[in-house]
Amino acid sequence: MEPDCSKRARSGWVRTAADLPTRPFTDRILGVATNLSKVSVLTLDYAEVKPRMARTTKRTYRAVPGSGVRRIWAGGQPSLSGGRLARQGFVYYAFDGWPIRDLARSFSAELAQELTEAENEVRRLNDDPPRTQLLEAVARQLLRSEAVASSRIEGFELSHRKLAEAAFDPEDTSLNARAVLGNVRAMDEAIRFASEQLDLTVTEIRTIHRRLFEGTRDAAIGGVIRNSQNWIGGRDNPWGARFIPVPEDQVTRLLDDLCRFAARDDLSAIAQAAIVHAQFETIHPFSDGNGRVGRSLIHLVLRRRGLAPYYVPPVSLILAANYEEYERGLTTFREEQVEEWCGIFARAVTIACRGAGELATRIEELKARWREQAGSPRADSAAAKLIDLLPVQPVLDMRTVQDALDVSDEAARLGIARLESAGILSEITKRKRGRAWESVGLFALLDSFERLVATPTGGSTPMRRAPRPTRRPSKIAAR
């Protein structure tokens, strides 16, 4: 009788030789497997049958990190990585998923206190009327900050200036810019859905994913749930992978289970968002874009629960700045140490809220300086309205101003001219037609904010570079 290899190795260790089942082509396993950080050798005796000849061959394979579901990389095909090993094949383990629908809602006193503190910070951010009004004015730019940070976790580097230019002129953008714009669209979709107070469905998850890839060269994979094994890290095979998600035949069942858990209202909204995100990362239902969709679900859960009706703090900024702790937290969740992961997430939310409050204060101060520079324009003037618009639309042209402020061509022209002469706007096209301007000071402020949250907290070293100070304006094509 074969040993049961479907159980999860809760400590993160791959099964030992004694635990592995016998297969027709793996008669004996002589070595032992490994843990998640070190790779040991597996030696297999098996019969290799070829036409007109049969022989028994001993080959040395390695075990790829993972746990739970034993799988075989068949090999026999050219490989961009892994060399002879990938061509010969090897044994690896996919994570054996576990349901969360009925996860207990009770937590330790220490975690309950951290969750309460995080929830209070989110409420304070949304309930303070003056601050909320300001955050709503800049929410679009901060959502882009969240998208930049979330995309940076996936390896896409883009400055706030470049993203603003891409949003202004989507047709003339780099592939990285389009990818980050897709992340903004995905978060927009999550927020739109949450505002309708509907329960999360697999269909909506696919819609968010589809929005992520709209307008990119990978648009064809948008919304398509995978039908084969995937892995995180490594290259074109599981060798060297940091984590191997659940097998493809578990994806649909676990997504349905995740949606049922997301519909619950009997536990902390912060804990619920943390668990939904970690479980989605563990399922990894798509061939690409899972992390960005998973972080969009944080917004969806917190808005749906009513904790953050106006503004979700930029949690991805904190997770990206402390990426090592983020990865460790996801690993502990997969080992069913749910409390440790929820604590990491709750602390990230608390820091993000406080950082967002600091950013709001700095933007308030910047707008006050702009008004002073512009000579204190009347509240109903195009110049005053334009100052309020700049945090949301830092790159603009005449048509943008006319549409956003509902003013005439002449009023828009005079408003732009007044702010340009005051040093608040700077032209970035240098053309007579198709002229565009950007706000002076906002990008430096946003970069400063990112450097602030990238500062180590609690002894943790940020795993990404803090953004460099803003340099001279770049040029963009005429619209």
Locations of regions flagged by a protein language model:
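FIC/Doc superfamily catalytic core
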Residues: 4-6, 19-479
